[in-house]
Every structure is written in C-alpha cells, then in structure tokens.
Amino acid sequence: CQNQKNEWKETYHLTYFYLKDCSNCQHFKKNVLPAIKKEFGKHMKIKSYDMDDEQTFDEMKETYQNHIDQIIDFDEDDYGYGPMVFLEGYMAILGAGNEDDYVEHLVNAIKGEKLNEAAEIETYYYLKDGKVQKS
C-alpha cells in the first residue's frame, strides 16, 4: 500500500527558533527538517533563527516576540525554549518528536484535518489568526 503523495499548490512558510546546545533542536534539524523538505519541497519556505547568535540577537528577539505574541495562552515557562516552530498562519509546535508524525501534523494543519495527538515532547500552540483552532 503506497503512501498517497500530496500535491502542494501553494507556498507555505515555516519559521523556527533553535538553540545550538539543545538536543531536541538538533534532532529537529537533522531528522525533522529533511522530512519536511521531502514532503513539501519548494512549497515550504523555511527560515531559522539561532537564539544564541549574538550578532542577530536583536532581530531574532524581535521576531521571536512577534511570533510569541500571536499565540493564544502561551505558557511563559516555555519562553526561550526550542525548537519553537511556526507554520505561519496555521499553528506553532514546541518540541519535536518522530519526524514522520511531525510532517503529518503540518500536513493535517494545512489540509484543515484533525491533528493527531502531539508527542509527549511536543506542545501545540494555536495562533490568534491561525487557520487551525483548538478543537
């Protein structure tokens, strides 16, 4: 039985914030990002921000704050943790579990389908103007 390949027409935007020494961020970069690229190809524009980089710190902090401000009921205890991933206009996910499941979260969000349960390490966040709303 073959996995039905999705045909993406639009371009989506993913913004993520990471820390160099965070093992889950490394897992996201090494395993999850390639899986996202494989699924979406050129239809997913990805922008990353290193939360440790002093040279881009001010720009990163402003962008991070703007993104956090879009979240409904953000848990301040999660502030500054990574990987913090925003599927622009849809939702945000803090933490990354299995890469295939993660890609499925994004696919379901974009298609407007019910999200699978988040992995233990993941937290779904909903955006004030996001297309995905808490069910």
Predicted regions and their residues:
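Short active-site neighborhood of thiol/selenol oxidoreductases, capturing the structured segment around
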Residues: 7-21
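Thiol-based oxidoreductase modules, predominantly thioredoxin-like and allied folds used
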Residues: 17, 41-60
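Second-shell loop/turn segments in exported
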Residues: 19-23, 47-49, 92-94
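C-type cytochrome heme c attachment motif
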Residues: 20-27, 84
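Typically the conserved alpha-helix immediately C-terminal to a functionally engaged Cys/Sec
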Residues: 25-40
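Extracytoplasmic/secreted envelope proteins and their assembly/folding machinery
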Residues: 29-33, 57, 61, 103, ...
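Short, structured active-site "lid" loops
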Residues: 61-91
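Non-catalytic, surface beta->alpha helical segment in thiol-disulfide oxidoreductase systems
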Residues: 79-132
